[in-house]
């Protein structure tokens, strides 16, 4: 009994220590955000939480992919992995009229291997830890599209940092691969090597990865021109509060009370 009491006290101490640590992290993050220069954009970025939002994201994908892969774009629709646990869809929308301006899908390996792992065998150093893969990037054309793209890249980093991701993995076609290279992502395989990817229509892609925990330091040391924009500017228009993307209806029963009707909940 004494051992159980000691174990219980130890567990309470550990849990209390963890909760205290989380509170400290939240306070530290709030303090850092308060010191950043605020900047407003003519659009917002959020995690989609309803089917009509997902349709907006697909609309952007079709337009964006249609510029380079029209036949592929025509067949694009909501994909099963859009609703997978551990996956979020970012959606950029105009503040003026709510029109969709950009989107990106982020899948983590919390519940299942990344999509890229169905196409290639990742090296040992990239197999362990928490991983995230960004796919289905699409933005509107013109100047606004370029700004939206940079904000989506920033949102990707912030989300990975928020979720304590160790490595971000990217599969990119040319010439988008050079943009990730400019953001200090590095080749996972051969230098600038393109590999057909089964999970994205067997199109040749370059596989790159970025270590989340050292990104700030690396960008600062490299005097990256976007360092201030990404790390020292607060964009309140980015809302990365968690949302559940699994929209299927789930029947939940209560065996102890058979007289209570089953209720369908959206997951």
Would you name each region that the model predicts?
Residues 74-81, 193-198:
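Short, solvent-exposed loop/turn elements at beta->coil junctions and helix N-caps
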């Amino acid at each position: 009994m004494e051992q159980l009491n000691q174990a219980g006290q130890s567990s309470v101490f550990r849990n209390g220590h963890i909760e205290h640590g989380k509170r400290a992290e939240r306070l530290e993050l709030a303090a850092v955000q308060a010191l950043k220069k605020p900047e407003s954009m003519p659009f917002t970025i959020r995690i989609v939480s309803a089917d009509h939002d997902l349709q907006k994201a697909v609309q952007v994908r079709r337009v964006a992919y249609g510029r380079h892969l029209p036949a592929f774009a025509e067949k694009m629709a909501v994909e099963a992995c859009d609703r997978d646990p551990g996956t979020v869809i970012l959606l950029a929308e105009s503040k003026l009229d709510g029109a969709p301006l950009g989107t990106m899908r982020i899948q983590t390996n919390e519940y299942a291997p990344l999509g890229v792992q169905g196409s290639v065998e990742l090296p040992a150093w990239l197999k362990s830890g928490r991983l995230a893969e960004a796919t289905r990037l699409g933005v509107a054309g013109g100047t606004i599209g370029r700004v939206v793209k940079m904000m989506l890249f920033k949102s990707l980093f912030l989300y990975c940092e928020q979720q304590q991701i160790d490595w971000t993995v990217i599969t990119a076609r040319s010439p988008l691969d050079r943009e990730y290279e400019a953001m200090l992502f590095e080749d996972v395989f051969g230098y600038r090597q393109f590999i057909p990817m089964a999970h994205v229509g067997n199109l040749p892609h370059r596989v790159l990865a970025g270590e989340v925990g050292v990104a700030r330091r690396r960008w600062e040391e490299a005097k990256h021109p976007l360092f201030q924009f990404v790390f020292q500017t607060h964009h309140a228009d980015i809302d990365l509060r968690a949302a559940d993307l699994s929209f299927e209806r789930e029947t939940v029963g209560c065996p102890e009370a058979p007289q209570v009707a089953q209720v369908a909940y959206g997951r």
